[in-house]
């Protein structure tokens, strides 16, 4: 079950100071006496802290995330509706939900908040940070966190299906999805009541996202031009599939949260304010397993190849599957084999 801790204050990059900031989290395993065996799992856009649910194939004895050896931690990202500070949580200064007034978080704000949370849990250093998509963005930002003596706070990195910065291609996808939400009359500039949210807009945004998360061979191979029964109202099977996923998200997510998180993703750029992009990547010295997907059209393999080219201690592995971007949430056995083998060969030296 998810637990919650409170960070007393947090000042964001834009100067906003928040107080009594909740952070939801789950853990598996036991933190060692030196506080150095933590493995941080960073979740994706609409994910939550329940790693056992969406990455169960990687979690367990003998697997990539081994609670008999690791203190596995997943922290909910601010902006998400699953327990951390977000548009759906109460602003202690007003006694009302943040709603449309939720301040903009950057990926760096998230990492700074999560570091405070980890330190509250007694973590002194993280042995490995692993995550895909939005989670991979946070993994790369963790590379720049240092201890008081200047050593890396996170000793090894596993960014999956992500690049070192959000490109115009990815920003454009998010912008179009947000516009679908804004076009819903129930959006009301984000001030909608909790019992009457812009469900059509959010469902449409999810439908658009699902297309980008798959690949043409995946959708063509699964659905082709198959038709649905007339009474369904959607002529083609792929339409029914997209409507299904749109409606599922509406039942478990919030439109303001979706807007906040996609905007946070757009801030992702490891070189912002740090200098030349290639030089910044070359400064990341931690052992890194970069995982790409050969059918990913949203974060194409060329972006992981670029990361691996510049990260001085990187290993590149490729998941070959037709599913597209979401392969890292589908081909769990293959991903587990890659991560567990790499950790056994490389990361044992950093888990002291």
UniProtKB/Swiss-Prot annotation:
It catalyses: L-homoserine + acetyl-CoA = O-acetyl-L-homoserine + CoA. It is an enzyme of class 2 (transferase). It is found in: Cytoplasm. Its EC number is 2.3.1.31. Pathway: Amino-acid biosynthesis; L-methionine biosynthesis via de novo pathway; O-acetyl-L-homoserine from L-homoserine: step 1/1. Residues 37-330 form the AB hydrolase-1 domain. Substrate binds at residues 206, 326. Signal peptide: none annotated. Keywords: Acyltransferase, Amino-acid biosynthesis, Cytoplasm, Methionine biosynthesis, Transferase. Transfers an acetyl group from acetyl-CoA to L-homoserine, forming acetyl-L-homoserine. Homodimer. This is Homoserine O-acetyltransferase.
